[in-house]
């Protein structure tokens, strides 16, 4: 099953999600809009198994990183009936 990893602009650049991922799906990239001047990125989503350890590790009130199955992502965008 394919998964979609979304990183939101609430990311504080703490690297907790990157360190929690057992498959190195996430990495930190430079980002001017973030306090820490870096933000999580998910360049290898094809390796994501949906364990959601990144979500559990995120310390922000609104999770900055979310993992969806393809069908969940489609539903959340209002594209499925």
From Swiss-Prot:
The membrane topology of this protein is: Peripheral membrane protein
Residue ranges that the Swiss-Prot or TrEMBL entry lists as coiled coil: none
User: Which free-text remark accompanies the cofactor?
Assistant: Binds 2 [4Fe-4S] clusters. Cluster 2 is most probably the spectroscopically characterized electron acceptor FA and cluster 1 is most probably FB.
Listed under GO biological process in this entry are: photosynthetic electron transport in photosystem I
| 4Fe-4S ferredoxin-type domain mapped to chain residues | 2-31, 39-68
Has the keyword Repeat been applied to this entry?
yes
Gene3D superfamilies reported for this sequence: 3.30.70.20
- The residues the record assigns to binding [4Fe-4S] cluster 1 are 11, 14, 17, 58
Gene Ontology cellular component? chloroplast thylakoid membrane; photosystem I
A GO molecular-function descriptor: metal ion binding
EC annotation from Swiss-Prot or TrEMBL: 1.97.1.12
Q: Where does [4Fe-4S] cluster 2 bind?
A: 21, 48, 51, 54
Which PROSITE patterns does this UniProt record tie to the protein? 4FE4S_FER_1, 4FE4S_FER_2
The cofactor named in the record is: [4Fe-4S] cluster
Q: Which InterPro entries match?
A: 4Fe4S_Fe-S-bd, 4Fe4S_Fe_S_CS, PSI_iron-sulfur_center, PSI_PsaC
* UniProt KW keywords: 4Fe-4S, Chloroplast, Electron transport, Iron, Iron-sulfur, Membrane, Metal-binding, Oxidoreductase, Photosynthesis, Photosystem I, Plastid, Repeat, Thylakoid, Transport
| Organism superkingdom | Eukaryota
- Predominant location: plastid
Catalyses which reaction(s): reduced [plastocyanin] + hnu + oxidized [2Fe-2S]-[ferredoxin] = oxidized [plastocyanin] + reduced [2Fe-2S]-[ferredoxin]
UniProt subcellular location: Plastid, Chloroplast thylakoid membrane
Complexes and interactors = The eukaryotic PSI reaction center is composed of at least 11 subunits.
Function of this protein? Apoprotein for the two 4Fe-4S centers FA and FB of photosystem I (PSI); essential for photochemical activity. FB is the terminal electron acceptor of PSI, donating electrons to ferredoxin. The C-terminus interacts with PsaA/B/D and helps assemble the protein into the PSI complex. Required for binding of PsaD and PsaE to PSI. PSI is a plastocyanin/cytochrome c6-ferredoxin oxidoreductase, converting photonic excitation into a charge separation, which transfers an electron from the donor P700 chlorophyll pair to the spectroscopically characterized acceptors A0, A1, FX, FA and FB in turn.
This chain belongs to the protein called Photosystem I iron-sulfur center
This chain's source organism reads Stigeoclonium helveticum
Which gene name does the record give? psaC
């Amino acid at each position: 099953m394919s998964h979609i990893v979304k990183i939101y602009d609430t990311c504080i650049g703490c690297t907790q999600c990157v360190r929690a991922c057992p498959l190195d799906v996430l990495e930190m990239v430079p980002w001017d809009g973030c306090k820490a001047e870096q933000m999580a990125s998910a360049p290898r989503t094809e390796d994501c198994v949906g364990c959601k350890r990144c979500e559990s590790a995120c310390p922000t009130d609104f999770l900055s990183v979310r993992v969806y199955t393809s069908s969940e992502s489609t539903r959340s965008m209002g594209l499925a009936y």
